[in-house]
Amino acid sequence: MKSPIIYVCAALAEIAGCFAFWGWLRLGKPVWWLLPGMLSLAAFAYLLTLVESQAAGRAYASYGGIYIVASLVWLWSVENVRPDRWDVTGGCVCLIGAAIILWGPRG
């Protein structure tokens, strides 16, 4: 049951790492932003290896839903852009899909 917690931590690491590149290339932030960005992306990759899954592809697929919702939280909390009803609806659909992949019975 620790997988959802790992996914949330991985999502924060991935989004922060990608945002460092976004900041450098699109917002004019200094090049040194890339160092914490790369460390954050390395932490993201490491965290996904800790997920309880027998197949990497399944771990990545179920992570996708968490990533999408975490991106919407980032949108609101860091970029000060409130998600609209379509963002929220899409996020809910993605979470349902991630739950099916993560906890679906395997035969």
From Swiss-Prot:
InterPro entries: UPF0060. Keywords: Cell inner membrane, Cell membrane, Membrane, Transmembrane, Transmembrane helix. Signal peptide: none annotated. It holds the Pfam family UPF0060. It is found in: Cell inner membrane. It is a multi-pass membrane protein. The chain crosses the membrane at residues 5-25, 31-51, 59-79, 85-105. GO terms for cellular component: plasma membrane. Its main location: membrane. It comes from the Bacteria. HAMAP family: UPF0060. Belongs to the UPF0060 family. This is UPF0060 membrane protein RPD_3084. It comes from Rhodopseudomonas palustris (strain BisB5).
